[in-house]
UniProtKB/Swiss-Prot annotation:
Phosphothreonine modified-residue sites: 13
GO-annotated molecular function: haptoglobin binding; heme binding; hemoglobin alpha binding; metal ion binding; organic acid binding; oxygen binding; oxygen carrier activity; peroxidase activity
Residues bearing the modification Phosphoserine: 45
Protein name, entry field: Hemoglobin subunit beta
Pfam families attached to this UniProt entry: Globin (PF00042)
Annotated positions of the N6-acetyllysine modification: 60, 83, 145
Species, as recorded: Ailuropoda melanoleuca
Family: Belongs to the globin family.
UniProt function note: Involved in oxygen transport from the lung to the various peripheral tissues.
Alphabetized CDD domains for the sequence: Hb-beta-like
Tissue-specific expression: Red blood cells.
Binding site for heme b: 64, 93
């Protein structure tokens, strides 16, 4: 569960309504793979990830980034039940994919950077603080099934 004030919730949902999930999702996942290259090992089937340009223009990275942000959107609709919302994804990433749960935190922080880049002055420190709460809550929910 993420505890947001009414003002924080309005800031998060208001900004999110303007997010282009296709664009931001691909950019966020791409940046994760470039900035933290060890995360690429989970994406062997994505083809060429050999350079930053290859990563950022990879159609599979873009498609998966969109999928990730669509899941994040579901989380925003269920802030009071993030663990339930992400239970199956947590199980998948833990039991089948063996993703280090620290990567969820990294992706959340990269997403915040991408949002700041896209929204500039509209992404105020108050909006950032609210988003940091949300991405921390989502990362925690995704790590829930880990032993």
């Amino acid at each position: 569960m993420v505890h947001l004030t009414g003002e924080e919730k309005a800031a998060v949902t208001g900004l999110w309504s303007k997010v282009n999930v296709d664009e931001v999702g691909g950019e966020a996942l791409g940046r994760l793979l470039v900035v933290y290259p060890w995360t690429q090992r989970f994406f062997d089937s994505f083809g060429d990830l050999s350079t930053p340009d290859a990563v950022m223009n990879n159609p599979k990275v873009k498609a998966h980034g969109k999928k990730v942000l669509n899941s994040f959107s579901e989380g925003l609709k269920n802030l009071d039940n993030l663990k339930g919302t992400f239970a199956k994804l947590s199980e998948l990433h833990c039991d089948k994919l063996h993703v280090d749960p620290e990567n969820f935190k990294l992706l959340g922080n990269v997403l915040v950077c991408v949002l700041a880049h896209h929204f500039g002055k509209e992404f105020t420190p108050q909006v950032q603080a609210a988003y940091q709460k949300v991405v921390a809550g989502v990362a925690n929910a995704l790590a829930h099934k880990y032993h």
